[in-house]
């Protein structure tokens, strides 16, 4: 048995910070899936022993796919799944063709983890509910549930793990991503550098706006509260951002930007530049 699936990045059309609660910030955001050439391809098959292969930039125990499998095992034990089902996770050979950059605000690691949880549930016919998958996803990473949901567009609230489908004209094939090479943003560092400028009371209003309305009405600073702290913490990013025209927007905590595609013939899809 070999199961192969594709995983696509997300962008944050808007990301507004409400307040800090405990160690983390409460946010509201609109996440949209972007389907173009930038994608990870994951293959899962049965083998004699467990393996996880891919061009990863972290130790195994910090890998989001490995974390997802550990969370899944614990969950299946709690749900009284059979010993053979749980042991079957120890004989999976997982291979990832990694193309979505990490530390870019595109949800690369979360996309892989969310995709794996969703597809394993389908492959093995465990019939876990979306709510159960979300419980696991929130333990792996804040963006993971968006990728579990398989939604094209969704509102994310709380710490980013509460996902609600947003019905709108899909932008999945209308967005173009620019992911600068060799420029990485630490989510932790960017959030630590965030300084609240004004009290934010318009959460519900933002959650009603269509993504297209947001992109055509506001600039990248107005849409993403993490742009300024990201520029403060990363001089290389600041140099790049200063040269970008207003049509480019900032995703997550960076370092990637995105824009509505030029609909003329010959328009590029995905940029990865120096």
Curated annotation (Swiss-Prot):
Pathway: Isoprenoid biosynthesis; isopentenyl diphosphate biosynthesis via DXP pathway; isopentenyl diphosphate from 1-deoxy-D-xylulose 5-phosphate: step 3/6. This is 4-diphosphocytidyl-2-C-methyl-D-erythritol kinase. It holds the Pfam family GHMP_kinases_N. It comes from Helicobacter pylori (strain J99 / ATCC 700824). It is an enzyme of class 2 (transferase). One of its GO terms (biological process) is isopentenyl diphosphate biosynthetic process, methylerythritol 4-phosphate pathway. It catalyses: 4-CDP-2-C-methyl-D-erythritol + ATP = 4-CDP-2-C-methyl-D-erythritol 2-phosphate + ADP + H(+). The lineage of its organism: Bacteria, Pseudomonadati, Campylobacterota, Epsilonproteobacteria, Campylobacterales. GO terms for molecular function: 4-(cytidine 5'-diphospho)-2-C-methyl-D-erythritol kinase activity; ATP binding. Keywords: ATP-binding, Isoprene biosynthesis, Kinase, Nucleotide-binding, Transferase.
């Amino acid at each position: 048995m070999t199961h192969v699936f594709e995983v696509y990045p997300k962008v944050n059309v808007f990301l507004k910070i409400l307040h800090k609660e405990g160690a983390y910030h409460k946010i509201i955001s609109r996440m949209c899936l972007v389907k173009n050439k930038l994608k990870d391809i994951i293959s899962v098959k049965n083998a004699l022993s467990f393996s996880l292969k891919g061009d990863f930039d972290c130790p195994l125990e910090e890998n989001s796919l490995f974390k997802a499998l550990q969370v899944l095992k614990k969950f299946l034990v709690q749900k009284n799944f059979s010993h053979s089902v749980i042991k079957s996770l120890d004989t999976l050979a997982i291979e990832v063709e990694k193309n979505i950059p990490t530390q870019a605000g595109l949800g690369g690691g979360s996309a892989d983890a969310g995709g794996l949880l969703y597809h394993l549930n389908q492959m093995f016919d465990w019939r876990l509910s979306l709510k159960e998958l979300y419980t696991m996803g929130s333990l792996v990473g804040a963006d993971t549930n968006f990728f579990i949901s398989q939604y094209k567009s969704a509102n994310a609230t709380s710490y980013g793990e509460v996902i609600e489908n947003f019905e709108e004209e899909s932008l999945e094939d209308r967005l173009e991503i620019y992911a600068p090479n060799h420029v990485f943003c630490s989510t932790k560092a960017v959030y630590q550098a965030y300084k609240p400028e004004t009290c934010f009371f318009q959460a519900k209003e933002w959650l009603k706006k269509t993504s297209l309305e947001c992109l055509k009405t506001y600039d990248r600073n107005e849409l993403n509260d993490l742009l300024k702290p990201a520029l403060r913490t990363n001089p290389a990013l600041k140099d790049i951002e200063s040269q970008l025209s207003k049509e480019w927007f900032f995703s997550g905590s960076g370092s990637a930007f995105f824009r509505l595609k030029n609909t003329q013939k010959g328009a590029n899809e995905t940029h990865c530049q120096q």
